[in-house]
Amino acid sequence: MIEWLSERNTLFVEQPLPKEMIDETAWIRERSPLPIMADEFLQRLPDVRRAEGVYDGINIKLMKSTGLREAYKMAVLAKALGMKLMIGCMTETSCAITAAAQLAPMMDWADLDGNLLISNDRFDGARLVDGQVTLPARPGIGVVPV
């Protein structure tokens, strides 16, 4: 399946197996033509070191990593280890998406569209414009209530 995906311009494969299947994931990674990214495997800073050699990169989500400071430390460590970086999200308001977007310049990929799934988002913040995350030019992280 990964071979098939690689022939169709897929960028990477995210968490192909349950997080407990560490050896099996490392086996897949050794044979994969695509980078293998950690998601459920990863929550906090110590998990980044555990991901080394098992995954090619990590998907950092603020809601799992406890916030900007921890997420930043995770990104710095992963970069030092030569890993790929992605900032991701779950279904979250524009407040959380805008906070996560502060780290986007450090990342190889950004998947920050969780606010688009909310019909009653109470915040105005980062926006997706032509596939690019644009940060507001306001103080702090730039979020305001609507």
Residue positions per predicted region:
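General beta-strand structural signal in soluble alpha/beta enzymes
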Residues: 14-15, 38-39, 87, 110-112, ...
